[in-house]
Regions:
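FMN-binding flavodoxin-like domain, especially the glycine-rich phosphate-binding loop
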Residues: 1-97, 129-131, 135-142, 148-150, ...
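Cysteine-cluster motifs in flexible loop/terminal segments that predominantly coordinate metals
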Residues: 98, 104-137
């Protein structure tokens, strides 16, 4: 549905849905935080979404900052070859910062206890530190848009890009991403030998 809407020219605001299971059990934490029952938490989330939809205007910046994340080699990657063409066409329309998340530079989330994740997240950090805390979190905060360069490995993201997404949880505790545009450049190949985007 999101892809069809995007292809039709729609822009989706950050967190554009309120998702409730049949029992609304996925609203337990929100209900506790709000001092209400499950239905009250669900309705509060829906009301907050309606307010954001009602007041949303697409941000206009003269020269937006774009963060580009990848986990590929510039020398051998079809994904990076396609990005080079896109980057060239962007010209000076935006400021671009690229961060490579290659093997060995990014540890995946190992599932800290909820309270520990909140503790570090409120400081804008993550227990596991590394490139995420030093480079990626500050870059995500500054960026107006994020581009994820994704080779398609058996209909899935690479491990490093999956780790990046998993580790965003700590940053989300402090920074909502509602004002950021998200783009993906996905490249599939036939055993890595042909470029199909």
């Amino acid at each position: 549905l999101a892809l069809a809407a995007d292809m039709a020219g729609c822009a989706l605001i950050g967190r554009p849905l309120v998702e409730g299971t049949g029992s609304l059990a996925n609203f337990r934490v929100q209900a506790k935080n709000l001092g209400t029952d499950l239905m009250g938490a669900y309705l509060a989330a829906a009301q907050e979404l309606v307010q954001r939809l009602d007041t949303f205007t697409f941000p206009q910046k003269e020269r937006p900052e774009l963060l580009v994340l990848h986990a590929s080699s510039h020398h051998t990657s079809n994904t990076m070859a396609l990005w080079a063409g896109v980057r060239e066409r962007l010209g000076e329309v935006c400021s671009v910062q690229e961060i490579g998340l290659r093997n060995g530079t990014l540890d995946d989330c190992s599932g800290c206890p909820y309270t520990m994740c909140i503790h570090f997240g409120e400081k804008g950090e993550c227990f596991y530190g590394g490139v995420m805390s030093r480079e990626v979190y500050p870059a995500v905060r500054r960026a107006d848009g994020v581009v994820i360069l994704c080779p398609n490995y058996n209909d899935a993201l690479s491990a490093n890009l999956t780790a990046f997404i998993n580790r965003l949880t700590a940053l989300f505790r402090q920074t909502r991403f509602y004002d950021k545009a998200l783009f993906a450049l996905v490249v599939s190949g036939y055993s890595g030998s042909d470029l199909v985007a």
